[in-house]
Amino acid sequence: MANNNLKKLLLSPISDNNPIALQILGICSALAVTTQLQTAFVMAIAVSLVTAFSSMFISMIRNYIPNSIRIIVQMAIIASLVILVDQILRAYVYDLSKQLSVFVGLIITNCIVMGRAEAFAMKSAPLESFVDGIGNGLGYGAMLVIVAFLRELIGSGKIFGVTVLQTIQDGGWYQANGLFLLAPSAFFIIGFVIWAIRTWKPEQVEK
């Protein structure tokens, strides 16, 4: 029974309760870091780790946090983990860290991270909170990867920086669509994905 609950916590945010597609959270970073698959993957991993470990740590001390300062404590824990992730990125993948710019630091204010801490971790056991954090990170990351895949492929004819569709400028046949390298294109793609998910799962349509 416990395993089934953990499995549901892990898998539900990917399709049934996706943070971006259903809850409409984390949109800003979905627009900013999805021009390339590489940055989208790194951002997805960073958010997943921060959400999982912050939820676990908050759950472990939830009975000792005064209600009046719980948000401050949550933000302090989240901020500490974000700083750690940012420093690791700067140390080992500096170029990617520069591409992600301020958006790693802005994980602190990401509604998904704060939302899971407040709505779930404050009421649940550490293991469940950790799995819930991983699940929501995967759901967020799945949307980022879908958006980044389409934007990079259509916008530049590349995947992970490797040419897949030879552009006219390089002597090929494909005319790259520069619109997909601009942030507004992510809105259209996210909207299309939301439509596709709700066509597949009609129960997600608001009444």
UniProtKB/Swiss-Prot annotation:
Q: Can you state the subunit structure given in the record? A: Composed of six subunits; NqrA, NqrB, NqrC, NqrD, NqrE and NqrF.
Q: In which family does this protein belong, per the annotation?
A: Belongs to the NqrDE/RnfAE family.
Gene Ontology terms describing biological process: sodium ion transport
Tell me if Membrane is a UniProt keyword of this record: yes
The listed locations are: Cell inner membrane
Tell me which PANTHER family the record gives: ELECTRON TRANSPORT COMPLEX PROTEIN RNFE, NA(+)-TRANSLOCATING NADH-QUINONE REDUCTASE SUBUNIT D
Q: Which residues cross the membrane?
A: 20-40, 41-61, 69-89, 102-122, 130-150, 177-197
* Lineage per the UniProt record: Bacteria, Pseudomonadati, Pseudomonadota, Gammaproteobacteria, Pasteurellales
UniProt-listed Enzyme Commission number(s): 7.2.1.1
| Keyword terms of this UniProt record | Cell inner membrane, Cell membrane, Ion transport, Membrane, NAD, Sodium, Sodium transport, Translocase, Transmembrane, Transmembrane helix, Transport, Ubiquinone
A single GO cellular-component term on record: plasma membrane
Does this UniProt record's set of keywords contain Cell inner membrane?
A: yes
The way this protein sits in the membrane is described as: Multi-pass membrane protein
Protein name, please?
Na(+)-translocating NADH-quinone reductase subunit D
Q: Name one Pfam family in it.
A: Rnf-Nqr
Q: Which terms does the record give in the GO molecular function aspect?
A: oxidoreductase activity, acting on NAD(P)H, quinone or similar compound as acceptor
InterPro entries the record matches: NqrD (IPR011292), NqrDE/RnfAE (IPR003667)
Native organism: Haemophilus ducreyi (strain 35000HP / ATCC 700724)
Q: Which reaction does it catalyse?
A: a ubiquinone + n Na(+)(in) + NADH + H(+) = a ubiquinol + n Na(+)(out) + NAD(+)
Described purpose of this protein according to its UniProt entry:
NQR complex catalyzes the reduction of ubiquinone-1 to ubiquinol by two successive reactions, coupled with the transport of Na(+) ions from the cytoplasm to the periplasm. NqrA to NqrE are probably involved in the second step, the conversion of ubisemiquinone to ubiquinol.
